[in-house]
Structure formats: C-alpha cells, structure tokens
Amino acid sequence: MSFFAPRNKKTEQEAKKSIPWVELYRPKTLDQVSSQESTVQVLKKTLLSNNLPHMLFYGSPGTGKTSTILALSRELFGPQLMKSRVLELNASDERGISIIREKVKSFAKTTVTNKVDGYPCPPFKIIILDEADSMTQDAQAALRRTMESYARITRFCLICNYMTRIIDPLSSRCSKYRFKPLDNENMVKRLEFIAADQAVSMEPGVVNALVECSGGDMRKAITFLQSAANLHQGTPITISSVEELAGAVPYNIIRSLLDTAYTKNVSNIETLSRDVAAEGYSTGIILSQLHDVLLKEETLSSPVKYKIFMKLSEVDKRLNDGADETLQLLDLLSSISVVC
C-alpha cells in the first residue's frame, strides 16, 4: 500500500483500546464520582444556583479531584464549550510568575457571550490549576491579584495534595473541599466493573491485591490493572504479577523479615538483610509494608509497637538523607529483635 494512500479510520472498538483506562473510565458526570458524597452534593447545588465560588480541592492522589472539576465543567458548559471556557494547567506545564501573568491572565480577562442549549452556561470561565501546591510562593502571590481582578468573569479551581502549601491569602479566597481516600468497597466494585468491561480474567484475590498495592489511589489501581492485562494477554492475572508491577515486596518476604527478627539471631538477621537487598527491593517500600503488617500484629503490645514505629521513622529519615539501604534494614531488624 502506498504511503499516501487513504487509511481506514479506526473503528470505535480500536479507538477504545488505544485510550488509557484511566481516561476511558474517568467519571463524566458528578453522579459518577465515587466516595465523595458531601462534596458532590454541595457542587450539585452550585449547578442549580449558577453561583460558583473559587474552589480549593485537596486530598490524597487518585481520589477524584481533577475528575470532579472536569465533570462539573462538562455539566456547566457541555462538551462543545469546554475548550473555550475551561483552561487546565497541570504539573507538566510551566507555572512560574510569567505564565500566571501572561497565559492565565490573558485567558481570565476575556469575556464570554456564547451559550449552548441544554446547559446552564453561566457567564464565567473556569481555570483549573492542578498540583497547585508545587507552585512557588511568588507565583501564588501573583495568582492572588489575578483572582481578585477577574472574579466577575473567571473562577479558579486549585487542586493540591497538601493544603498547607497554599499561601493563606490564596486559600482564604477559595471554598475548600476535602477529598477523602476511596474506601476499599467502592474501589473493588469499580475495578471489577472495569475488568468485566474489558473481558479481563483474574485469579481470586487479585482485586484486593490491586487495592492494597495502590494505597487508596484509584488512578494507580486502574493503571496496574491495565498493565497486568497487557502482560497476561488472555491468561488470568495473578497476585504475584500485580505485586511485581506495583514494586511491592511479596508478603512472605515481609513475614520472613519479622519472624527472623523475633528469633534474635544476629547472624540470620544480617544474612537475610543482605539477601533482600541483593534482590533489589526498595527499603523504603519494605518500611511501609512492615508498618502495615506490624499494625495488625496482635502478639505485640502497644508500647512495643510504639518503640518499633519510632525506629521506623528514624530509619525512614536516614534513607531520605541518603543512607545505605542494607545497613538501615539491618539496623531496623536488629532494633526489632531487641524490643520484642
């Protein structure tokens, strides 16, 4: 076939396969947003009144912050006006003072007139600043002035993981909405729906492993599911595949680390620490998983757990400062053997 010959358009099914599942199953309406009932209820009332304030969405990653404001914008303006009425800047965009003064300001000051039947189309635009907590304080200060100057025709939605990193003059001008981590039940239902829709077969316990490895981050869980489905291509997804894709340490290794520490045999502790490090497992991830297992360890008293968790935090701090991972794991296990 000639290079310049006309190509057949992708079928709807082929186009669907090429879209990342995170985007394919992103909520399109506020009703589809899961586990954020109070926030959705308040936003629905603003739809009826057309009186939308500046907003600050904060909470853990993958809880639906960006999806919620996009769904709200879609219900306000409809798909036709989304491009002209909504400006989204995320972490991949430069958001220094120059961008705030030029791109954001030029979009904010343009007036709006056109409407679409069937949608409220209030007389303002929406500017979405994703991961606003990564903006410099100077850029945030410049944004404050822009928010004040164009409040009549523009609404801002700041999205962040940590509200404390937003300067007070900016956060005080916004209505704040906390997005809580998704509960396991809703995550399981959504993942099972996606797996059924994509005709993906899974071994028992895989969905729970996805929830566990993602730590309440729905976006991460869906990405792991798609990666595992691509890896297996028709064969059932296994728990070990999910753990490997997520970079998680298998439970039997975590259990072995604790059991060896309980024996108080220094030689065995040193050997196992070196073996685990040689396997390439991240000590930071091991700390996180040890913490979760120790929380449920019924054989340990609260004072003992307290001492271990204090040591965990100390080792975590050293790792962040660049300390050797093998030595830190050895130090942690030795400390556990002493206090138990």
UniProtKB/Swiss-Prot annotation:
Its main location: nucleus. GO terms for biological process: DNA repair; DNA strand elongation involved in mitotic DNA replication; DNA-templated DNA replication; mitotic DNA replication checkpoint signaling; mitotic DNA replication leading strand elongation; UV-damage excision repair. CDD domains: AAA (cd00009), HLD_clamp_RFC (cd18140). The keyword Oxidoreductase does not apply. Keywords: ATP-binding, DNA replication, DNA-binding, Nucleotide-binding, Nucleus. ATP binds at residues 59-66. Transmembrane segments: none annotated. GO terms for cellular component: chromatin; Ctf18 RFC-like complex; cytosol; DNA replication factor C complex; Elg1 RFC-like complex; nucleus; Rad17 RFC-like complex. One of its GO terms (molecular function) is DNA clamp unloader activity. Changing residue 59 to V: Not functional. It is found in: Nucleus. The keyword rRNA processing does not apply. The elongation of primed DNA templates by DNA polymerase delta and epsilon requires the action of the accessory proteins PCNA and activator 1. Subunit 2 binds ATP and single-stranded DNA. PANTHER family: REPLICATION FACTOR C / DNA POLYMERASE III GAMMA-TAU SUBUNIT, REPLICATION FACTOR C SUBUNIT 4. Heteropentamer of subunits rfc1, rfc2, rfc3, rfc4 and rfc5 that forms a complex (RFC) with PCNA in the presence of ATP. Two other complexes exist where rfc1 can be replaced by either ctf18 or elg1 to form the ctf18-RFC or the elg1-RFC complexes respectively. Belongs to the activator 1 small subunits family. This is Replication factor C subunit 2. It comes from Schizosaccharomyces pombe (strain 972 / ATCC 24843) (Fission yeast).
